[in-house]
Design a protein with these regions (language model features):
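Short, low-complexity disordered leader/linker segments with a strong preference
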Residues: 1-39, 62, 123, 421-424, ...
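Extracytoplasmic/periplasmic substrate-binding proteins
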Residues: 43, 55-57, 213-221, 244-333
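Extracytoplasmic "Venus flytrap"/periplasmic binding protein-like
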Residues: 59, 63-136, 172-174, 276-277, ...
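Hinge/lid segment of periplasmic solute-binding proteins
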Residues: 102-160, 188, 217, 297-299, ...
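Short, solvent-exposed loop/beta-turn-alpha elements that line the ligand-binding surface or hinge
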Residues: 118-136, 180, 203, 223-244, ...
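Extracytoplasmic/periplasmic solute-binding protein
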Residues: 143-156, 161, 171, 185-234, ...
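C-terminal capping/gating helix-and-loop segments adjacent to ligand/active sites or protein-protein/ligand interfaces
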Residues: 146, 375-429
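Glycine-centered hinge/linker elements that transmit conformational signals in sensory
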Residues: 188-193, 231-260
């Protein structure tokens, strides 16, 4: 599955493979007859694609006088959005189009009253009945499918974790900026050398309200986030491999070479030239390149020696929650627009996310040229063969399970418990919930 998924996404981003795709520009077909207002919920802050969201919404509204899209930013990433969404659904005030994080896919399918897109399209927009086949390949659609194969949304944003670094700090520390760390052993060594030679902090790994990059380091060391025992999903991270990976991060913090802080603090330290390396999503590329006081450079997510690199596909997919027929029709027009090659090229350029559909790499607005000229994008694309699915805790307690593992991160990185202790205790708690 991993190789097929990687091949698909490489193909979707490669101009050499696709020369075009089915059109999604029939926004007027099956259009809305009266003025309809819909809400679009997202997690794009001002420094993480928020400006691009506003531009896309404004462009859509200008082209569709009978539809008014109101965008709403939800803080605390996908956990915060999902919690807000639950409250909205409970009060009967559903948003219409929602960016749902991949790690909440199973939870959303089992616990949120979403609108099934495929039968809705068949009924209200039959001219788009082949949208899925024309726009995406089967394995790409599978990203937004539950474990039992139910399609609950449409792929939108694809990201991978990468290692951004400051070449000026590398040079000052006696490191070669053209030969960045390839393994975690080299990351630890580089972080120590940066601190000793320059006084700057060496390393920071993002601390969003999720476990995305932590999954990458755990599974790249041979561990697992989840396991299936007798048909039941359980926590899989109570292993020596997972503990060793997490302890490596904690030891860097303990030794004074790694940073345990909020994202705002960590990212600002990097952008202001006071941090050598930051491990985070390629989705931060555009903001970093615009805001940094130095040339931003990226390297692939580090490996463990002799072990296979595994990076979870980050980002989000689009779900529909409209119940009113007019809102459903309007929401579908908006989804088609933001999934169009032109809009996706703007979204990818304004963020760093990789496009999930055919044709975007050949977009006349220049994303093809950007891929060819931007080495940081090329770095992200190079890790596509190592993609795995972002682990998603199932069941009604999935959100609570996710939060327990987030809490364990703080316990481990603050040195309150060893990684082995914290992961063992957390696994027991999660298994009692699932």
């Amino acid at each position: 599955m991993k190789k097929k998924l990687a091949a698909l996404l490489l193909a979707a981003a490669s101009a050499m493979v696709f020369t075009g795709c089915g059109s999604s520009d029939n926004q007027s077909k099956g259009g809305v007859d009266k003025k309809v207002q819909i809400e679009y919920w997202h997690v794009a802050s001002e420094s993480f694609g928020g400006t691009t969201v506003k531009e896309l919404v404004a462009d859509f509204n200008a082209k569709h006088p009978n539809i008014q899209v109101v965008e709403k930013y939800n803080p605390d990433m996908y956990k915060g959005l999902t919690q807000n969404l639950q409250a909205a659904i409970a009060s009967g005030k559903n948003p219409d189009v929602v960016q749902m994080g991949w790690s909440y896919l199973n939870y959303a399918a089992e616990n949120l009253k979403y609108t099934d897109l495929q039968p809705m399209i068949k009924k209200m927009a039959p001219e788009d009945k082949n949208f899925w086949k024309e726009i995406y390949l089967p394995n790409c659609l599978a990203l937004a499918q539950t474990d039992d194969g139910k399609q609950i949304g449409i792929p939108y944003s694809i990201s991978v974790p990468v290692l951004f670094y400051n070449p000026e700090i590398f040079t000052a520390a006696g490191l070669d900026p053209n030969n960045p760390p390839k393994t975690w052993k080299e990351v630890v060594s580089a972080a120590k050398q940066i601190k000793e030679k320059t006084g700057n902090m060496g390393f920071f790994m993002q601390e969003y309200a999720d476990n995305w990059t932590q999954q990458a380091i755990i599974e790249s060391n041979g561990g697992s986030m989840l396991k299936n025992e007798g048909g039941k999903v359980k926590a899989g991270f109570d292993t020596p491999e997972a503990a060793a990976a997490y302890q490596l991060l904690a030891d860097m913090v303990k030794d004074g070479n790694g940073l345990h802080a909020t994202n705002e603090e960590g990212f600002q330290a990097y952008l202001s030239g006071k941090l050598g390396m930051v491990c985070t999503t390629i989705g931060k590329r555009a903001n970093f390149e615009k805001s940094a006081k130095f040339k931003v450079m990226a390297a692939p997510f580090p490996q463990f020696e002799g072990k296979e690199l595994k990076v979870p596909a980050g980002g989000n997919f689009l779900m529909l929650f409209s119940k009113d027929a007019d809102k459903q029709k309007a929401a579908w027009e908006f989804i088609k627009y933001i999934e169009s090659p032109e809009a996706l090229a703007k979204w990818s350029t304004g963020t760093g996310y990789l496009p999930p559909r055919k044709g975007v790499a050949d977009d006349p607005n220049g994303f093809k040229k950007m891929i060819e000229e931007n080495k940081n994008i090329q770095v992200a694309l190079s890790t596509m063969p190592n993609l795995v699915k972002w682990a998603s805790f199932p069941g009604a307690n999935g959100l609570q399970a996710e939060q327990l593992l987030i809490d364990a991160r703080d316990i481990i990185l603050s040195g309150k418990e060893t990684a082995a202790q914290a992961l063992h205790e957390t696994a027991e708690k999660i298994n009692n919930l699932l």
